[in-house]
Regions:
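Bacterial signal peptide processing site
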Residues: 22-24
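C-terminal motif of bacterial Sec signal peptides marking the signal peptidase cleavage site
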Residues: 17-20
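Bacterial N-terminal signal peptides that target proteins for export
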Residues: 1-10
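C-terminal His-loop and adjacent cap/lid subdomain of alpha/beta-hydrolase
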Residues: 27-304, 308-721
């Protein structure tokens, strides 16, 4: 049955120069503004690829610009929109000092340039790493270290006969090209240009309506592009040490309306389960778009399962990269979701090895509709926690095995994120019961820190209090469930999280939603209680928004009967609604924060609702009725008493007290057993996690823990000869 006991900030950093936040209007009187150099591509300290789109503000007609003494004045001109814009190319690695001079006045700004192959903010890059450019239709990588290859441009079109996109040859154009009318009212031939290239050791793809007979400059984009970007994120959670492949960007719903569609293989969480790497890749790809195609009005995203995690995490931890998101079959983050994966692993092991909680009662202690959800978690994602699950690289020393290949590539999600988590210190290397694991860790100088903790967790507590299981079963379960070590071996005792893993809170690994109120959210919840995409995760994110910000005015939840696939009519309604919502926020020039503008500019359709299986019926907006139509369940930690926020990875403790169990009677022997299982007490869910701290946006992970970037650099004024 559904879980009945539920406990239902920080302002985002202002990113004035962040790529893709908005297009500026031409200045009405440039000479009244102070001289200023503005990098439009990205923050000036995070530029990559040796170039940057730059605006000069407040200048007249006689001025010069140089980069470290190299004259680049010729790159700039007053464009048709009235703004002085130019693309500075040939930036050196590291600091580049840009100086603007006009008479006795001037401005100076340092642009910090990083390689297009990364890294910038996500920390040290993993090794080994296989280049797979030829799988994406590109030439073989010119450099096996950076996996770079020349860009590929292709044209496709929609035929008047319908169907999918077809190859288009500009030298021999077909005669059956369809026409599309964009959301700006422009009717154009339905031809797109698709660009595929390498960036950040991944592979990106982007597509946009494109007339092959016309030019395109970032200060003069072709008119069919509406200036908006649609960004799909990929599903699942995987730890492959390869480039992978990007999402299909031939999205008719978006392209036909004039959107650009873009994504990177590193936004495929099923390929690369590192959300900091995903954010870095979004940032770099958007910078490339601004440099080559022009400023982005706003970016709206979509994605199911792991794709929802990518959206939630990028939106919260790097505010300004995404303005609106459409998470589908959603989760709040991958780290708190990992609690459910490992808890299920332990519960299945307990039940299958003679535990007194039988399969018939399994759902009562797991919080699920039945046993199938944990079985699915075990089959799909236990290998992602197991370092012997494989990392998908053919290069390097092969895959890890504690006994036979201790120096091999470890495929666990924590090892995939070692650049953020850091390594376990030497005093922990003997905490495994496996001699092979202990020897392997000592050989390589420490594995990645492991954040899993189940000390104090009373598995099955709600089931006990509800009378679904007995005191005998409750004691047996908690005595025997045990835990896992850093190599995913079963251990008889409970596990304490490795010291240092509390940095996951600061780094936003466990998503506190503190910055997420600056993002418009339509959560598309296909009801699915028989497998892993259980419904409570949508409501858990709502609870986190409420906890962090005191409201959830920026989040809608739309529930429907199908599980993973959004019905096309609902998908289109969500797309159009989110677009209208963001356009209204963009047009709101009144006072107030972005968060306030999101709350006050909702379209009429931007409300919570559910859709019945009757396609002809109007959506139901009585949420009590929706809860009856689509009940939602929980997780092992919710049954253990954690609030629906599901955000406590390592709980503070309280004493074990008989009175906390109501009418449940324990024998003295049972009580003694519980006391031995919980020597430090049981979880006090009313308190924050151990060593909790709020998330800090815009961290750069050039070492475990991360460093806050702070406000974007701005140019400084110069005066004198």
């Amino acid at each position: 049955m559904p879980i009945l006991r539920r406990a239902l900030g920080l302002a985002p950093v202002l990113l004035l120069s962040l790529a893709g936040c908005s297009r500026s209007d031409p200045a009405t009187d440039l000479k009244t503004e102070p001289l200023e150099i503005r990098v439009l591509s990205n923050r000036a300290d995070l530029v990559s690829g040796d170039d940057a789109l730059v605006e000069l503000v407040g200048i007249g007609d006689d001025w010069t610009v140089d980069v470290d003494g190299r004259d680049v004045t010729g790159a700039f001109a007053r464009r048709d929109n009235g703004r002085v814009l130019g693309r500075i190319e040939g930036l050196a690695a590291g600091a580049n000092v840009v100086t603007l001079k006009q008479g006795s006045q001037g401005a100076r700004l340092t642009i910090t340039n990083h390689p297009s192959s990364g890294p910038i903010i996500a920390g040290a890059q993993l090794q080994p790493w296989d280049c797979t450019t030829t799988d994406a239709g590109l030439e073989a990588a010119a450099d096996a270290t950076t996996c770079t290859a020349p860009v590929l441009y292709e044209f496709f079109y929609k035929s008047t006969a319908g169907g999918s996109f077809r190859a288009y040859d500009p030298e021999n154009p077909p005669t059956d090209v369809a026409t599309t009318t964009t959301d700006q009212g422009k009717s154009v031939p339905y031809i797109i240009r698709q660009e595929t290239g390498t960036q950040n050791r991944g592979i990106y793809t982007l597509a946009v309506l494109f007339d092959p007979a016309q030019g395109w400059e970032p200060w003069a984009p072709q008119s069919a592009w509406n200036g908006k970007l649609h960004y799909p994120f990929g599903a699942s959670c995987g730890t492959n040490h390869t480039q992978g492949s990007a999402q299909n960007v031939q999205d008719d719903l978006a392209l036909s309306r004039g959107f650009m569609v873009a994504s990177s293989s590193l936004n495929e969480l099923g390929h690369a389960c590192n959300t900091w790497l995903s954010a870095e890749s979004v940032m770099m790809l958007k910078e490339h778009i601004v440099d080559r195609y022009g400023e982005i009005r706003y970016t709206m995203a979509e994605g199911c399962s792991g794709g929802s995690i990518g959206q939630h995490m990028v939106g919260n931890n790097y505010p300004g990269l995404l303005q609106g998101i459409q998470p589908n079959c959603s989760y709040m983050d991958n780290w708190s979701t990992g609690l459910e994966v490992i808890d299920c692993h332990l519960l299945l092991n307990y039940t299958q090895n003679g535990g007194l909680v039988t399969p018939a009662l399994f759902g009562k202690v797991s919080g699920h509709q039945g046993m199938s959800s944990c079985v699915a978690w075990e089959g799909l994602f236990a290998p992602v926690v197991d370092p012997e699950g494989g990392c998908g690289a053919s290069s390097g020393n092969g895959e890890y095995n504690a006994a036979t290949n201790p120096a091999g590539c470890r495929g666990s999600v924590q090892d995939y994120n070692v650049g953020v988590l850091g390594k376990r210190s030497a005093e922990l290397w003997d905490d495994s019961p496996s001699a092979d694991t202990r020897a392997a860790e000592a050989l390589v100088g420490g594995f990645a820190r492991f954040a899993y903790d189940n000390t104090g967790v009373q598995y099955g507590l709600e089931a006990l209090l509800d009378g679904a299981i007995t005191a005998v079963q409750f004691v047996d379960l908690n005595q025997k469930i045990g835990s896992v070590d850093v190599d995913f071996n079963f251990t008889p005792g409970r596990r304490t999280a490795d010291p240092g893993t509390e940095l996951l809170y600061r780094a936003g690994g466990i998503n506190d939603a503190a910055q997420l109120d600056g993002v418009a959210i339509i959560d598309l919840r296909g009801t699915s209680n028989a497998e892993i995409h259980t419904d409570y995760h949508s409501w858990g994110m709502r609870a986190r928004l409420d906890k962090a910000n005191g409201h959830h005015d920026n989040q809608l939840i739309w529930t429907f009967a199908s599980s993973l696939v959004v019905p096309p009519s609902i998908g289109e309604l969500s797309f159009v609604t989110l677009d209208a919502w963001l356009a209204a926020v963009e047009a709101d020039t009144g006072p107030g924060t972005r968060e306030q503008k999101i709350a006050r500019n909702k379209p009429a359709a931007a409300v919570d609702q559910c859709f019945t299986s009757d396609a002809s019926a109007p959506p139901e907006r009585d949420m009590a009725r929706c809860a009856t139509l689509y009940p939602y369940y929980g997780s092992p930690r919710l049954v253990a008493g954690m609030p629906i926020t599901h955000d406590n990875g390592a709980c503070q403790k309280k004493p074990l007290v008989r009175e906390d169990y109501g009418s449940v009677i324990f024998t003295d022997a049972q009580w003694a057993t519980l006391a031995s299982v919980f020597p430090d007490g049981v979880c006090d869910w009313s308190k924050p996690p151990q060593l909790w701290s709020p998330s800090v946006p815009w961290l750069t992970h050039d070492g475990a823990g991360g460093v806050a970037l702070g406000e974007p650099p701005r140019s400084t004024a110069l005066s004198g000869p």
